[in-house]
């Protein structure tokens, strides 16, 4: 199938592009002979992102600044310790009377009303505490009275601890003779809800949670409970508001030192959490990897991960007192080859932590990289899926719809599975530039999300698409030149074979690896059909003999035109690989590629003879041959000569290398046999399911056998994952190991619903990777 002829490239239709980025891409196709303006834009964008790795930015919090402003001077209790914070409150009230990140003047139904209510009330209390800012207090009270009903609306997203903190602030305001024109019933209802929430926390031993929101406890404040969660920097959970309340209630010098350090760094206003640099930098790495642009920032990413690993080894509180940071650090460190255990994450993961959407989401991501031996200690981590399902079953407000979409995608497309380029496309299209996070109050960080990431990701995606289209055209010409299209018995799957590698080895510099992978994928498909239906035993044997002899006279030594075409195509591909691989490896690998092909064809011949002779092997005998005959060897093994590292003979002959291949191929064979069982059973072909039924325990039915085999696949996958991720004792370079892992993702994709290439929906995905333009969902929603 010539995909490029049957699909007109939609990239030529610029009206389909997102408006904000079409001008950038248009520039890349103009100004011939001059410096490409797009490259200049991209280089500038990359420089800005590189600088962000060094400079972490986080928005200031009016809520936390208000609590710091309430702190009395140790030397003069009737004076504020931080008058500069009071001045900031006076000068930073919004024109609707509120304080916070959102101005509600033109958007009265904005979903952050509860956050604005608690921030505004905290600021009012702080100003009243020191009898300043009467005008600001009155404007703030007017805002609260107009919006107080939102405090009890379930459809409004709640900051962490709102049901305890906001009623606590109301009590504080009442003690300061601040008169809110609210119904007594509403006030009583909130206090009752607060009491129930406090009882629930105490009964479930949620002291850590109560310490984090301790500024809302009022008369129930317990320093003996809170001080257990004081960190080395003097703070309570790195929270300025909780730390300020701790100093107000119990003049702890560590708390004051922390607050002084905050003001030294930030001036007259503070963020809602500090330090937060480690989490933010890890979020940068995660975002950049998800958007498919990590190849631009390898040095910066390595620096972040090295620093994170140092903190992990030293048991830094930034990691181990926060579930989200711990889960994110564990996942990124493990998949990048650092030796880390999930035990610290398991220790801090509890039911309360998983009720937070981001904590449950990150923990769920982490659950997919647990090894087999981790499962017993990681039971709480594995429960995260249940909490995510509960989250998306609840009514979503407008702000939570974005996180709900993330959750739905996480459950449908688990991290560390799926094809990299498909995931990248989905992540780009769903990317939210304005990624507001909610703790006790909302905050933004341009390091976590910004237009530069999106701009670079979109341009990089389109650049790769243009490369893919040219490579696919070249492959289609190669198929015709080698007469493979004339073999009527063979499936023509050029686009599918190329797609499988473009979706995994996507970087522009990996062109040789993609061509090698795709050519051998095309050839293994044709050869498989030849050994299956297209050739006689004599022809199959003759083809093997020609490859063994190598330097043959095709007119004399090939017994048929089919053998002639196949041998010449094989020789052309293998010689090309040998010549190109020499440039990468500085040695001749042709003999290894030939040997890989011979191993495959001999295994296929063995199966053909078994079928001819009606021989039924044992299940073990079948599998020892079938993992080779599944035909992944010629696809993956030659391709890894082109991914970067040099591979010695010692490496390619090592037990580690062989185990990688066997684990990958066994998964593929089992998936294939499960999905093709009914068809192959009717055709009388050998199949692992059929052999399992005939050789296994009596009375077992197909469903039981398939369930056992799926569990075997799952275990093999975890075993392979461990081999891929772990570096201790490994001699196979990580980039090479990743090729085996990528092929597993390819197999899962092709066999998700159908038997290999037969899926009707796969063509649309092929188009998405090679041809179709991106559709930026969030941008389109904003335009509407």
From Swiss-Prot:
Pathway: Plant hormone biosynthesis; gibberellin biosynthesis; Secondary metabolite biosynthesis; terpenoid biosynthesis. Mg(2+) 1 binds at residues 528, 532. Its cofactor is Mg(2+). Mg(2+) 3 binds at residues 672, 680. Keywords: Chloroplast, Lyase, Magnesium, Metal-binding, Plastid, Transit peptide. One of its GO terms (cellular component) is chloroplast. InterPro entries: Isoprenoid_synthase_dom_sf, Terpene_cyclase_plant_C1, Terpene_synth_N, Terpene_synth_N_sf, Terpene_synthase-like, Terpene_synthase_metal-bd, Terpenoid_cyclase/PrenylTrfase. GO terms for biological process: ent-kaurene biosynthetic process; gibberellin biosynthetic process; terpenoid biosynthetic process. Pfam families: Terpene_synth (PF01397), Terpene_synth_C (PF03936). It is found in: Plastid, Chloroplast. The keyword Transit peptide applies. Mg(2+) 2 binds at residues 528, 532. GO terms for molecular function: ent-kaurene synthase activity; magnesium ion binding. It catalyses: ent-copalyl diphosphate = ent-kaur-16-ene + diphosphate. Accumulates in leaves. The keyword Protein biosynthesis does not apply. It comes from the Eukaryota. Its EC number is 4.2.3.19. The Asp-Asp-Xaa-Xaa-Asp/Glu (DDXXD/E) motif is important for the catalytic activity, presumably through binding to Mg(2+). Belongs to the terpene synthase family. This is Ent-kaurene synthase 2, chloroplastic. It comes from Stevia rebaudiana. The gene is KS22-1.
């Amino acid at each position: 199938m010539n995909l490029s002829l049957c699909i007109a490239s939609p990239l030529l239709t610029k009206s389909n592009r997102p408006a904000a980025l079409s001008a950038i891409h248009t520039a890349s196709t103009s100004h011939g002979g001059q410096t490409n303006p797009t490259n200049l834009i991209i280089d500038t964008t990359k420089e800005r992102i590189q600088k962000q790795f060094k400079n972490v930015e986080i928005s200031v919090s009016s809520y936390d600044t208000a609590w710091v402003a309430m702190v009395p001077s140790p030397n003069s209790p009737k004076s504020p310790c931080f008058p500069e914070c009071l001045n900031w409150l006076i000068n930073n009230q919004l024109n609707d009377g509120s304080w916070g990140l959102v101005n509600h003047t033109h958007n009265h139904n904005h979903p952050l009303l509860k956050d604005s209510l608690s921030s505004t009330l905290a600021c009012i209390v702080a100003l009243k505490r020191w009898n300043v800012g009467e005008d600001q207090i009155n404007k703030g009270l007017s805002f609260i009275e107009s919006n107080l009903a939102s405090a009890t609306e379930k459809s409004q997203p709640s900051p962490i601890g709102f049901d305890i903190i906001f009623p606590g602030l109301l009590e504080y305001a009442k003690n300061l003779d601040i008169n809110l024109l609210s119904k007594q019933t509403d006030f009583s209802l909130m206090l009752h809800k607060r009491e129930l929430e406090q009882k629930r926390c105490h009964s479930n031993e949620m002291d850590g949670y109560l310490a984090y929101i301790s500024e809302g406890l009022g008369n129930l404040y317990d320093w003996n409970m809170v001080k257990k969660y004081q960190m080395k920097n003097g703070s309570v959970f790195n929270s300025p508001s909780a730390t300020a309340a701790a100093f107000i209630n119990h003049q702890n010098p560590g708390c004051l030192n922390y607050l002084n350090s905050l003001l030294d760094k930030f001036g007259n206003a503070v963020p809602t959490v500090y330090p937060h640099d480690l989490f933010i930098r890890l979020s940068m790495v995660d975002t950049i990897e998800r958007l498919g642009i990590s190849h631009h920032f390898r040095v910066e990413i390595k620096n972040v991960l090295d620093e994170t690993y140092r903190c992990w080894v030293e048991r830094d509180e930034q990691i181990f007192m926060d579930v989200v940071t711990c889960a994110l650090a564990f996942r990124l460190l493990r998949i990048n080859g650092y030796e880390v255990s999930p035990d610290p994450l398991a220790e801090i993961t509890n039911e309360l932590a998983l009720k937070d959407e981001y904590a449950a989401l990150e923990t769920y991501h982490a659950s997919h990289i647990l090894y087999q031996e981790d499962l017993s200690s990681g039971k709480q981590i594995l429960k995260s899926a249940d909490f995510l399902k509960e989250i998306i079953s609840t009514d979503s407000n407008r702000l939570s719809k974005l996180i709900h979409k993330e959750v739905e995608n996480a459950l449908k497309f688990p991290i560390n599975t799926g094809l990299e380029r498909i995931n990248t496309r989905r992540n780009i299209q769903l990317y939210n530039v304005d990624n507001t996070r909610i703790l006790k109050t909302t905050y933004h960080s341009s390091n976590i999300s910004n237009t530069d990431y999106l701009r670079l990701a979109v341009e990089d995606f389109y650049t790769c698409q243009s490369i893919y289209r040219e490579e696919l055209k070249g492959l289609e010409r190669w198929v015709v030149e080698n007469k493979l299209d004339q073999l009527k018995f063979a499936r023509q799957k050029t686009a599918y074979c190329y797609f499988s590698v473009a979706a995994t080895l996507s970087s522009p510099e990996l062109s040789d690896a993609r061509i090698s992978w795709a050519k051998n994928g095309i050839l293994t498909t044709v050869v498989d059909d030849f050994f299956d239906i297209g050739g006689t035993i004599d022809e199959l044997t003759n083809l093997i003999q020609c490859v063994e002899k190598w330097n043959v006279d095709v007119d004399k030594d090939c017994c048929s035109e089919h053998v002639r075409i196949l041998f010449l195509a094989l020789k052309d591909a293998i010689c090309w690989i040998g010549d190109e691989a020499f440039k990468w490896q500085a040695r001749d690998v042709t003999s290894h590629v030939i040997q890989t092909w011979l191993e495959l064809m001999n295994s296929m011949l063995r199966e053909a003879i078994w079928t001819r002779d009606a021989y039924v092997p044992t299940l073990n005998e079948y599998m020892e041959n079938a993992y080779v005959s599944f035909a992944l060897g010629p696809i993956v093994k030659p391709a890894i000569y082109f991914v970067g590292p040099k591979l010695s003979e010692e490496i390619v002959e090592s037990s580690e290398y062989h185990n990688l291949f066997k684990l990958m191929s066994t998964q593929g064979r089992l998936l294939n046999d499960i999905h093709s069982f009914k068809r192959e059973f009717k055709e009388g072909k050998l199949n692992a399911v059929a052999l399992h039924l005939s050789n296994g325990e009596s009375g077992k039915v197909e469903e039981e056998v398939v369930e056992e085999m799926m569990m075997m696949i799952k275990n093999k996958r975890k075993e392979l994952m461990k081999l891929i991720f772990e570096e201790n004792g490994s001699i196979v370079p990580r980039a090479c190991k990743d090729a085996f892992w990528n092929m597993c993702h390819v197999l899962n994709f092709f066999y998700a619903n159908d038997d290999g290439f037969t899926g009707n929906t796969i063509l649309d995905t092929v188009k998405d990777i090679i041809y179709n333009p991106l559709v930026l969902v969030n941008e389109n929603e904003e335009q509407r």
